[in-house]
UniProtKB/Swiss-Prot annotation:
Secreted recorded as keyword: no
Gene: OPG055
Family: Belongs to the orthopoxvirus OPG055 family.
Protein role: Stimulates increases in peripheral microtubule dynamics and may increase the motility of the infected cells, contributing to cell-to-cell spread of the virus. Seems to inhibit the signaling via the GTPase RHOA and DIAPH1/mDia.
UniProt protein name: Protein OPG055
Statement: the UniProt record of this protein carries the keyword Transcription: no
Pfam families: Pox_F11
InterPro entries: Poxvirus_F11
Record-annotated membrane-spanning stretches: none
Signals that turn on the gene: Expressed in the late phase of the viral replicative cycle.
Keywords of this entry: Late protein
Highest taxon of source: Viruses
Lineage, top ranks: Viruses, Varidnaviria, Bamfordvirae, Nucleocytoviricota, Pokkesviricetes
Length: 337
């Protein structure tokens, strides 16, 4: 959607106001201190810069943390629409959130208001390797809020200088409408609330200038490299889970064959068919060889995963693998019962 902006002047190019490294990790969020209404208002973002040339839409990144407990509720229902396209997989649905619950992402000057809200769900393997999700007003801001993250999530704002390699619950990234690229999700499930902030009638009547969008080629390359790295990590994790399942099946077969052979030996006087015993022993030897091979392959994959996953995320990945294996075991038990 678009509209006419009075007093549009020469396009200005502005860089990010907050400096940060290309690849950034945010530490575990600390508890928020209680502040007065005035302090809270002063700490809010300001999306418009007043200059001699008029009001200018800022091309800055605003990264912060906010409590999200009040935003829980609608994301629990599983009525998302799956978007499975080339290089893009995610689940999305529109959402309605009262403005009062979104106060943390509003600007201090009251120049923007919440318009549309969307919930985006990412499961293991979901995400973007190319492109981005564009929602909201072309002359506004888009706030991306992490409501839940059980795995390793990351996002990149196209053209920006910051890549968040691991998003935590409560993390908020606000940026002039450039879209958002969710990096491939490693393990678990993540849910984000995307809030479109549109200019208010007051700002439209006053008029403001949309500057030329800045670009950062280094960040774009870094985001592409990180996406490919995550794809490799996901593939190795899936292989590791498969090896674990095959190992458990091989151990089970080995135990059953050994028990059967023991039974045959116990009743040697009754079971005189030596060929049967030889066949069982041969199967046991083959199973043991398979186990050894799987153990060696598993060790190699574990080494690869360790080299690709950040140390801070090791426990998350381990927990996900264990949970996936248990889930498969439960499903098999239900099928056999």
């Amino acid at each position: 959607m678009g509209f006419c902006i009075p007093s549009r002047s020469k396009m200005l190019k502005r860089g990010s106001r907050k400096s940060s490294s290309i690849l950034a990790r945010r530490p575990t969020p600390k508890k928020m201190n209680i502040v007065t209404d005035l302090e809270n208002r002063l700490k809010k973002n300001s999306y418009i810069e007043n200059t001699n040339q008029g009001n200018i839409l800022m091309d800055s990144i605003f990264v912060s943390t906010m409590p999200v407990e009040t935003l829980f509720g609608s994301y629990i229902t599983d009525d998302y629409e799956l978007k499975d396209l080339l290089n893009v997989t995610y689940n999305i649905k529109p959402d309605i959130v009262p403005d009062i619950k979104l106060d943390a992402v509003l600007d201090r000057d009251g120049n923007f208001r919440p318009a549309d809200c969307f919930l985006v769900k990412l499961k293991h393997r979901d995400g973007f390797t190319k492109g981005a999700l564009y929602l909201g007003h072309s002359a506004g801001f888009t706030a991306t809020i992490c409501l839940k993250n059980e795995g390793v999530s990351g996002l990149y704002i196209p053209g920006a200088s910051v890549i968040r390699s691991n998003i935590c619950q409560g993390d908020t990234v606000s940026r002039s409408s450039r879209g958002v690229q969710f990096l491939p999700q490693i393990g678990g499930e993540a849910i984000f609330l995307i809030v479109s902030l549109c200019p208010t009638k007051k700002l439209v009547e006053t008029g403001f200038v949309i500057p030329e969008i800045s670009s950062n080629d280094n960040a774009k390359i870094a985001a592409r490299i990180l996406s490919e790295k995550r794809k490799d990590t996901i593939a190795h994790i899936d292989t590791l889970i498969q090896h674990r399942q095959q190992l458990e099946l091989a151990y089970y077969n080995s135990c059953m064959l050994t028990e059967f052979l023991h039974y045959c030996n116990s009743y040697a006087g009754t079971i005189k068919e030596s060929l049967l015993k030889e066949t069982i022993q041969k199967d046991i030897n083959i199973t043991h060889t398979n186990i050894t091979t799987l153990l060696n392959e598993t060790a190699k994959v574990i080494k690869l995963v360790k080299s690709l996953v950040d140390k801070e995320d090791t426990d998350i990945v381990n927990n996900f693998i264990t949970k996936e294996i248990k889930t498969v075991e439960v499903l098999k038990q239900r099928q056999n019962s």
